[in-house]
Amino acid sequence: MWKSVIYLFVLLLGVIRAEDVKDLRNNEVSIKGRLELSEIDISAYMIPRCSFRLYQIGNYSADKPFHQITRIKDKNGTFEFNHVPINHGVNESTYFVMTPSSRDFNLLPQRVLVEVTNIFNETTGKVEQQLKAFRNYFGREYFPSKDIHFPDKLEEMDALPYISIKMSKMLPFRDYLQQRNVGLLQSGPLAGILNSKWKIAAVITLLALMTFPYLVEKLDPETARAMKEEARKKQREKYVVKEE
C-alpha cells in the first residue's frame, strides 16, 4: 500500500513538473531598467537621444537570437524590454547583453550581462525565473575560457526591481558640420581681435587716444589752444641751452 502511495506521489510530482516545463515553452519575461542622471532632470528632448539594446548570446531555442531596442518611457528614466523569450527546461539559463547608448552622456556600466534561470519552487510547485545582472566593460569576456586558472569574474549588480544605468560624464560638444566659406568676422586677423577681450580693449583705448584731441578741439577750442601752446613750450625748452 505504501509503495502505491509513494508511486502516485512521485507520478503526481512528475506531472506537475512536466506541466510547468510545457507552460515554460511559451513563457516570456520582462527586463526592467532605469537611467539615473543624479541632479539632471530628464527632459522630453533627452528621451529620444537615449536608447538601450538587448540581444541574446549563448544557446537559444529560436531560429535566431532575440534582439530588441527600447527607449526611456517617462521622466523617471525607466525603460523596459518586453516579451523576452527564455530557454526551455528547469535549471536552464538564458543570457542577454544590454548596452546603453546616449548622444549626451557617457553611461556606465558599458555592458550588462543579464542571466535568467528557470528555478523550480518546491513550495509553490511552479517554475519561477531568477534574474541576475553582472557589470561588464569592453574588452572583458562574458564567459572566460576554462583553461584560465584565475579568470576575471564579472561583478554582480542589483537586477531587481530594475537594472540601474548611471551617468559617467557629459560628452563633449561635437560640431559635425563646418562652414566652408566663412566671413571676415569669423576667421582671419579681424576675427582674432573680435574674439579676444584684451585685444578689443586695446583697440578701444588706441582709438580713444587718437580721437581725444579732435573732440576737445570741437567741444572746447580755448582748452585745445592752451594744450597746443603748452606742448610747443615744452618742445622749445628741450632746445634751450641753459647759461651758466
From Swiss-Prot:
Domain of life: Eukaryota
Topological type in the membrane: Single-pass type I membrane protein
Segments crossing the lipid bilayer: 200-216
Residues spanning the signal sequence: 1-18
Sugar-bearing residue positions: 59, 76, 91, 121
One Pfam family, short name: SOP4
Regions of this protein lying in the Cytoplasmic compartment: 217-244
InterPro entries cross-referenced by the UniProt entry: Sop4
Record protein name field: Protein SOP4
